[in-house]
Amino acid sequence: MVVEEKRLVSHEIHLKQRPVGMPTESNFELVKVNVSDLKDGEFLVRNIWMSVDPYMRGRMKENKSYIPSFQLGKPLEGGCVGQIIKSKNNQFRVGEYVLGNFGWREYWISNYSNDVMKIDPNMAPIQWYLGILGMTGLTAYVGLLKIGELKGDDGDNNNNTIFVSAASGAVGSVACQIAKIKGFRVVGSVGSQEKVKWLLDQAGIDYAFNYKEVGENNVSSELRKACPNGIDIYFDNVGGKHLEAAIDNMKVFGRIVLCGMISQYNLSSLPAGPSNLFLAVTNRLNLQGFIVRDHYNMLNEFYADMSKWISEGKIKWNETVFEGLENAPKAFLALFKGENTGKMLVKIGSDALV
């Protein structure tokens, strides 16, 4: 008698409705699906960690962007780390760990593409490949060194000031510490006194303030106090009032790195732009946006530098973790409420599955 192998079932988070304004848990749906049988050249991955990132909010909208919108009734996507549990591909063996873009689900099948990369679990905790050793770290690195034209080790950096908004977040916290490694004076804005303390005591920056306590309309005056000689580079993760305040305080020929604008992602209608943009003309400012995937040619340089800084203890890395795939929507919503310090992650499965 032939005994049929029991079909593997995977849980996935689907986009049920497109959010208007701030997302709610009702926009998401936990779904059970059958996992297909493997074809030649394919391998099956069980996810262990998944990343939750602000850019995902943009993909929930139905508009043209640099990356396709999420589809209704389909699983969401995002960075993930998992372990191969079945394989019909000689290059990808059972037990190996891989980095992919198929988060928001328990299992996924790949036939290998440029979006899948093997990772070494002995080099660092596997979830770091979603953060400090992944796109998060690379975003901070590219933003400062390439877009912000940050020059290091020239002996004059103590006279130079960098301002980072959302400074205790995943990208912001790395940007702060890279700037300190390069010898710059660093000022950071965050949304709680606990985060102020982390930036000063752990990340080692020079000045941090709670914009909620100061008041968004008073960020400019707070920056005048924190940066009496002006700002050389502003690493913008927030947009809105923070961007306007930074423009007020930039030095002549200052650089503004437009990385993200989390203050605007959930607005149903966009506010007017900065009222002081003419200062970009008179002060000859450079404002440049960027998308990290345009700069993958810097990966080897990034890995070399970041690995060295981590081994030397120069980078402090923090994570906020939600347990269980079913809590991924809660983690996503918490991100926009400022409830994370460092990288927001969801732990889906145990570290060793095979």
Language-model features, listed with the residues they occupy:
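Adenosine-nucleotide cofactor-binding segment
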Residues: 180-245, 293
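Short, glycine/polar-rich helix-capping loops at beta-to-alpha or helix-loop-helix junctions
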Residues: 106, 191-201, 270-277
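NAD(P)H dinucleotide-binding glycine-rich loop of Rossmann-like/cofactor-binding domains
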Residues: 71, 76-83, 91-166
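Glycine-rich beta-strand-centered segment in the early N-terminal region that forms part
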Residues: 34-52, 60-104
